[in-house]
């Protein structure tokens, strides 16, 4: 059975009309992912970046070591933006980010059992529990990631008071203040555009095969002759690379440049090759669906 919630979710992902979404879900027996493909094949939806609904509160924070060779990024969730703005909560998150840069833990469960650097006794888990008791709101350390580099630097960018956090790792044999400028510019690009891949080598064959099939069906539906469809498909794959690979994207600060071209220009300035080696992007509440409150229903319950 196709529910209104399923139709709503598909509309949010694709931007397609309600009836088109319902038909696509019916055609695919309620499989949202396949329904997205059906809508794209019919030209009714743009290529979807399914990052999931963003609903949870909290903060994304980064920590960069003084030598800029090691860094971390963390997400700590809470229930309301009121607590997210609380100075004690911010302090907790900042300490957790700093501790994450040096941890040997491989997952969150192990990490939160470590002795907390913000107090003389107790673990990270204990510190979180204590603040939960004090502020009366549930909190959790959701995820963390580390980056390190030998020759080069790592820089960060935080957008929207902790809504989005980015780490960017640059490799370069020469030290220069220009590297920080480049890394911050690239980090802002990642925050703004949310590229799925660093470069073409990160795009797996399964993804490319799926895209090719969608483009092929689109071309045939447009009435294009079979003999030119393959050429059209490959042209659209090249466009896919340019839209989804960070180094091939048009730079948001100057559309005359791609990120790759901008980095090469700066390499000349430094006198050594600069390479964008890695990036990490966390968005607060990414993929977490928050319970939607029905105000009218809540009033009814209170009146009963």
UniProtKB/Swiss-Prot annotation:
GO terms for molecular function: translation elongation factor activity. PROSITE patterns: EF_TS_1, EF_TS_2. It holds the Pfam family EF_TS. CDD domains: UBA_EF-Ts (cd14275). It is found in: Cytoplasm. InterPro entries: EF-Ts_dimer_sf, Transl_elong_EFTs/EF1B, Transl_elong_EFTs/EF1B_dimer, Transl_elong_Ts_CS, UBA-like_sf. GO terms for cellular component: cytoplasm. It comes from the Bacteria. Its main location: cytoplasm. Residues 80-83 are annotated as: Involved in Mg(2+) ion dislocation from EF-Tu. Gene3D superfamilies: 1.10.286.20, DNA helicase RuvA subunit, C-terminal domain, Elongation factor Ts, dimerisation domain. Keywords: Cytoplasm, Elongation factor, Protein biosynthesis. Belongs to the EF-Ts family. HAMAP family: EF_Ts. Associates with the EF-Tu.GDP complex and induces the exchange of GDP to GTP. It remains bound to the aminoacyl-tRNA.EF-Tu.GTP complex up to the GTP hydrolysis stage on the ribosome. This is Elongation factor Ts. It comes from Clostridium tetani (strain Massachusetts / E88).
